[in-house]
Amino acid sequence: MEVLKKDAALGSPSSVFYFLLLPTLVLWYIYWRLSRAHLYRLAGRLPGPRGLPIVGHLFDVIGPASSVFRTVIRKSAPFEHIAKMWIGPKLVVFIYDPRDVELLLSSHVYIDKASEYKFFKPWLGDGLLISTGQKWRSHRKLIAPTFHLNVLKSFIELFNENSRNVVRKLRAEDGRTFDCHDYMSEATVEILLETAMGVSKKTQDKSGFEYAMAVMRMCDILHARHRSIFLRNEFVFTLTRYYKEQGRLLNIIHGLTTKVIRSKKAAFEQGTRGSLAQCELKAAALEREREQNGGVDQTPSTAGSDEKDREKDKEKASPVAGLSYGQSAGLKDDLDVEDNDIGEKKRLAFLDLMLESAQNGALITDTEIKEQVDTIMFEGHDTTAAGSSFFLSLMGIHQDIQDRVLAELDSIFGDSQRPATFQDTLEMKYLERCLMETLRMYPPVPLIARELQEDLKLNSGNYVIPRGATVTVATVLLHRNPKVYANPNVFDPDNFLPERQANRHYYAFVPFSAGPRSCVGRKYAMLKLKILLSTILRNYRVYSDLTESDFKLQADIILKREEGFRVRLQPRTS
């Protein structure tokens, strides 16, 4: 009887389950390894730091954002062109040779973003940053003309007005050490609202500051998900405090973009086109002129018109095509076509064109418009806020370089407090070199990741990165490649003298990415930054108590400083 009971226990469902579980797992593992044989075979030929069995370098990407970034860069840097890392079963390959970067970024085949971008989905939907295929192509083609120079020139007045507002706000910090990033972040949001979105700040019941802070915190959450194997799981993520906080932040972010679209649609229905903020500026200027004339409307003076005509003639004669606008001179993309080729009807600001296209039957829905607005608001504000903050920090450290920038601005403007013109920005050659050098040493987007659907044969050596791998352009290492830059860790604006650029590989400098998926707003960003930063430096001298060796870099999606961007301002004029 005892024997029968034991036999029955051995034949119970639970015992059969456990008996079959082990061989099932073994067979599954064998199948899984065989299905990845091609990946493992090619990965075995790639150089990289030694990792632990099974987990690879998983523990290197767990921890504080600043330490993760430093560890990954430190372990990759000793390898000349390429470095592989295993994050558990995931193969990540870092490339930082310009020849290899060109292969990846210039291709129309390797354009799929890495799987980590899926965490942006609740925020950005299928906007330009993460969409693929025909949807991405058609929307990119639709949006690109809204960031051509002829459109951007119409924003000059708004760039100036918002820059003067920043200068006024900075008076509260005279002589004190403070974090300039908060000011830069708020300013870039408000400039975006008035230019690309074409709405007035007066229609917003909250400033851009709350939006900017929400975006920064969202980036923290996304980066936490990138670093945690548990938070990557959607179900586990919904059980955490991060999920609730993400919902609150998205209410702020989407609340602003929804309000922007609603405001712009209302203006459209009333037949108003163009920037509402620009209309307000013009109305205010006319009112001031009317008051100066004793309340009598007069025929507009031809003097102002003649001045504008002379300005336009200067712009036409200027070597605009020779300017880089945030990338290596000579590197071209869909933002570099002749402005006359885009047609008069397409010379509309971003949101104007989106709404008009939908109204005229283009294949873009209200949801897709919102996704693109969310994307442009994110990409257009956080990157330039970081870039301008690094620039001011570096000016504060390198007083001799700041002297040359101030001398250049004084030669352009003299003692005048007049607003900058487009022609003025063309003459800010040394300031532009300083800005480009800032973006070289501290690129706002430190990593550009793509997921390979096909093998990628590299040019730098006899290496093939297998399909299924995530290949990442390590922009920080690319921009500090000692074979490209003589003193890669020294801040030297002369790295961007025309003769030096001419001898450099086009893809040795890609702060806004490059190729088909380059940042659609890079020209917008450079023009905005030149006017914003020149306006600040015309009014203030910048100081810093730190050196670059004190910078603790962290990459929460966007490259920033862990300790913040602390500077001190001294007024240049009374």
Curated annotation (Swiss-Prot):
Compositional bias segments (type: Basic and acidic residues): 305-317
CC annotations in GO: endoplasmic reticulum membrane
Cofactor (UniProt): heme
Residues covered by region (Disordered): 288-327
Keywords of this entry: Endoplasmic reticulum, Heme, Iron, Membrane, Metal-binding, Microsome, Monooxygenase, Oxidoreductase
Membrane-related topology note: Peripheral membrane protein
Entry similarity comment: Belongs to the cytochrome P450 family.
Name of the molecule in the record: Cytochrome P450 4g15
Organism of derivation: Drosophila melanogaster
